[in-house]
């Protein structure tokens, strides 16, 4: 399949064959094709497979070994050297402990965002530099561009796969040293390229969920590290209608897994989580996916991370932009104002199931400005 792609290092005066790029090889199709495209453009390409989870779990071990074998097969096919590295200690200290602390506080964190900031674009980048890399590359569906001397993060071309949401906490210095070879390609084309070149990963299923949980049930996994804290499920009026095993097992907007079924004297409509009351250990549920208590107009965040501080809005006056409060959500118009080192975002339209612990990520057009962890929500 012929594909025209602009050079990946347009601002680097060196020819491609003098530039070393180390690709983060996950054993999936996206990183495989990223390595292939770099190789085709003449870069000196190497791969690195990182192991970020060391807990003794048979299923996870088998998955990691399969991924490593697939990464090795692709590198052999492309005639590039594959390094391996174990970053499990750094992952535990900088990602997993935060994940547990957030769940203890009954919030719903996004460890993938922290993994990108702390591991893939920090530990991996530093390690690759020691191996002689001029740049690292990953299989993320996102792009970068230059503006006024700054490296900006842009959405990937494929709207169904854009991963800028997960990268908003990374800094511009890291992006300046990173290449995203498939950012201008749509996923079906990536698979077609891999199949045409005979890469073993061409039809491999995309990984989903949190990397260290794998295919296990989330509740079973969490119980391994955090003790259950049973409490009661109540409706919006405080009437008890069931029991829960722990607020940490539930998230705002959740429908499945509540275990309350039909409630005598109530309609058959499904129940949804509307609130988690930490002080009383009560899980508040409401009926109907459009119940008013599931919606909010405003959120506040923790410390705001602007990818390009020099280009960031001062917020000395209200700033208009779009936002996502979860991955794959269509962008929503909002107005930002300063709130300490965070922001207050007021949305034009009520937003459903905005969840403390998740991230609000802000955009201007296809430029990702940055984001922050959601602290509170409010209904006007």
Curated annotation (Swiss-Prot):
Q: Where is this region: Interaction with tRNA?
A: 161-163, 326-327
| Annotated site residues (Interaction with tRNA) in this chain | 140, 358
Keywords, A to Z, come to:
ATP-binding, Cytoplasm, Disulfide bond, Nucleotide-binding, RNA-binding, Transferase, tRNA processing, tRNA-binding
GO BP: tRNA wobble position uridine thiolation
Cellular component per GO, a single term: cytoplasm
Task: Give the superkingdom in one word.
Answer: Bacteria
- Cystine links in this protein are 115-211
Q: Does the keyword Repeat apply?
A: no
Q: What is its EC number?
A: 2.8.1.13
Compartment list: Cytoplasm
Q: Which reaction does it catalyse?
A: S-sulfanyl-L-cysteinyl-[protein] + uridine(34) in tRNA + AH2 + ATP = 2-thiouridine(34) in tRNA + L-cysteinyl-[protein] + A + AMP + diphosphate + H(+)
Q: Does the keyword Cytoplasm apply?
A: yes
Q: Which HAMAP family match?
A: tRNA_thiouridyl_MnmA (MF_00144)
Q: Which family does it belong to?
A: Belongs to the MnmA/TRMU family.
What does the record give as the function of this protein?
Answer: Catalyzes the 2-thiolation of uridine at the wobble position (U34) of tRNA, leading to the formation of s(2)U34.
Could you tell me what this protein is called?
Answer: tRNA-specific 2-thiouridylase MnmA
Where is the organism placed in the taxonomic lineage, from the top?
Answer: Bacteria, Pseudomonadati, Pseudomonadota, Gammaproteobacteria, Cellvibrionales
